[in-house]
C-alpha cells in the first residue's frame, strides 16, 4: 500500500477504496460460486481461479491510474471467489476425519503467503519499483502446477460419486433444527464481523500507524507487519486441531474474546510493546476462523460450497467495508483514532456464549 500511495498520490480513503473493491468482488461472488459448484462440481475449478489471480497480478504491476488499479484488484478478487469455496470443499472432503487439522493447514497456506508478501515486497519490490510486482506471477504459475494432482484426485472423487448416487441421496444428519441453525449462523457472522474489522485495521493501516507514531521506515514497517502476519499463520495452524480436541465453540470463545486485553492495550504501548501486542492479537484472532468455518460446515454438511463461500465472502466483505470506513476515519481524525476505536471490537466475542453445542442433538434431513 505505501508504494501505491506514493506512486499514484493516493489518499487514505483511496487506499481503503482499493481494499473495498477487492474484498467486495470476492465477497459478493464467493457464495454464488460456492452454490454453483455445489450443484455443478468442476474438477479443474482451482486452476481457473488461479488464472484470474495471475492476470490480476500482472495488471497490478503496470497500472498507471486508480481506475486501472481498481480493475486489477477486482480481477484478483474474482480469482479468490473461485479458489476459496472450492479449496475449502476439497479440504473438507479429503480430511479423513481430521477436519480441524485439514482446514488449518489449508488456511495457513494462505496466511503464510500473506506473511511472506510484505517481506518479499520489502526485498524485491520496494527497492526497485512497483513493476517488480510482476515477479509474483511466478508463484501463481507454480500454484497452478501444484493444483494438477489435486484436480485429478477431485475428478476421481466426482466420478466415484456419480457411480454411487446413494452417497449423495442418502440421509445426512444435521445437528440442529432449521431455526437453531439460522440462529447459530447469525452468531457466527457477528463474530466474523468483530474479527475482520479489527484485522482490517491491521492489514490495511498498521504500517501507516507505525510510520506515523514511531517514525519507522517503510521497510521497517513491512517487517513489523510480517511479524504480525506470521502470528496469524501460527494461530490459524493451531485453531483447527485444538478445535478437534476441545470443541469448536471453546476455541471460538477463547480466540476472539481473548484478544481483547491485547487490542485494548496496544494504542497506549511503546514500539516494542506494540510489536508484541500485535503478535498476540494476530495469534488469538486468527485461531478463530478455522473453528468458525468448520462449525458452520457441520451445521449444513450438504452445502459445503455455499457455507464456505458465505463465510469467506462475508469475511472479505466486512474487511473491505471496514477498510474504506477506517480510511476515511484516518483522513479525518488521524491514523491513531483507528486503533483507539477498533480496540473494542474483540469484546463482541461475548456473543459466543449463545452458540449451541453441536453434540447435544441430531436431526435428520
Language-model-derived ranges and their functions:
Residues 105-156:
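Helix-loop-helix hairpin linking two adjacent transmembrane segments in secondary transporters
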Residues 28-66:
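Conserved MFS/SLC helix-loop-helix module at the cytosolic interface between two early adjacent transmembrane helices
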Residues 243-292:
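C-terminal transmembrane helical hairpin of 12-TM major facilitator-type secondary transporters
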Residues 44-59, 250-264, 343:
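Structural signature of the two symmetry-related core transmembrane helices
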Residues 23-31, 114-115, 229-237, 319-320:
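Residue-level signature of mid-helix packing/kink "hotspots" within the transmembrane helices
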Residues 72-109:
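Cytoplasmic helix-loop-helix junction between adjacent transmembrane helices
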Residues 29-41, 236-247, 330-331:
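Helix-to-loop junctions at the C-terminal end of transmembrane segments
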Residues 181-229, 233:
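Extracytoplasmic gate region of multi-pass secondary transporters
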Amino acid at each position: 500500500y505505501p508504494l501505491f500511495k506514493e506512486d499514484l498520490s493516493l489518499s487514505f480513503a483511496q487506499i481503503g477504496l482499493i481494499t473495498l473493491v477487492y474484498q467486495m468482488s470476492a465477497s459478493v461472488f464467493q457464495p454464488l460460486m460456492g452454490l454453483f459448484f455445489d450443484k455443478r462440481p468442476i474438477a479443474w475449478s482451482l486452476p481457473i481461479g488461479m488464472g484470474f489471480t495471475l492476470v490480476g497480478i500482472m495488471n497490478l504491476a503496470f497500472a498507471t491510474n486508480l481506475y486501472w488499479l481498481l480493475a486489477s484488484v477486482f480481477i484478483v478478487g474474482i480469482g479468490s471467489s473461485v479458489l476459496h469455496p472450492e479449496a475449502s470443499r476439497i479440504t473438507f472432503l479429503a480430511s479423513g476425519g481430521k477436519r480441524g487439522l485439514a482446514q488449518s493447514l489449508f488456511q495457513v497456506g494462505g496466511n503464510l503467503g500473506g506473511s511472506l508478501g510484505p517481506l518479499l515486497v520489502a526485498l524485491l519490490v520496494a527497492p526497485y519499483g512497483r513493476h517488480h510486482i510482476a515477479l509474483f506471477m511466478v508463484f501463481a504459475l507454480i500454484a497452478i502446477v501444484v493444483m494438477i494432482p489435486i484436480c485429478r484426485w477431485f475428478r476421481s472423487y466426482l466420478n466415484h460419486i456419480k457411480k454411487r448416487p446413494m452417497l449423495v441421496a442418502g440421509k445426512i444428519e444435521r445437528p440442529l433444527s432449521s431455526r437453531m441453525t439460522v440462529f447459530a449462523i447469525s452468531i457466527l457472522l457477528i463474530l466474523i464481523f468483530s474479527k475482520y474489522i479489527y484485522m482490517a485495521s491491521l492489514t490495511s493501516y498498521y504500517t501507516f500507524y507505525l510510520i506515523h507514531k514511531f517514525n519507522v521506515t517503510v521497510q521497517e514497517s513491512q517487517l513489523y507487519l510480517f511479524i504480525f502476519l506470521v502470528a496469524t499463520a501460527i494461530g490459524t495452524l493451531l485453531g483447527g486441531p485444538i478445535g478437534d480436541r476441545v470443541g469448536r465453540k471453546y476455541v471460538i470463545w477463547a480466540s476472539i474474546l481473548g484478544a481483547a486485553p491485547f487490542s485494548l492495550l496496544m494504542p497506549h504501548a511503546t514500539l516494542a510493546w506494540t510489536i508484541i501486542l500485535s503478535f498476540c492479537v494476530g495469534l488469538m484472532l486468527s485461531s478463530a476462523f478455522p473453528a468458525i468455518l468448520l462449525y458452520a460446515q457441520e451445521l449444513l454438511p450438504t452445502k459445503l460450497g455455499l457455507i464456505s463461500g458465505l463465510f469467506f465472502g462475508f469475511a472479505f466483505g466486512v474487511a473491505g467495508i471496514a477498510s474504506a470506513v477506517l480510511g476515511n476515519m484516518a483522513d479525518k481524525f488521524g491514523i491513531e483514532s483507528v486503533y483507539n476505536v477498533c480496540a473494542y471490537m474483540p469484546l463482541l466475542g461475548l456473543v459466543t456464549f449463545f452458540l449451541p453445542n453441536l453434540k447435544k442433538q441430531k436431526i435428520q434431513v
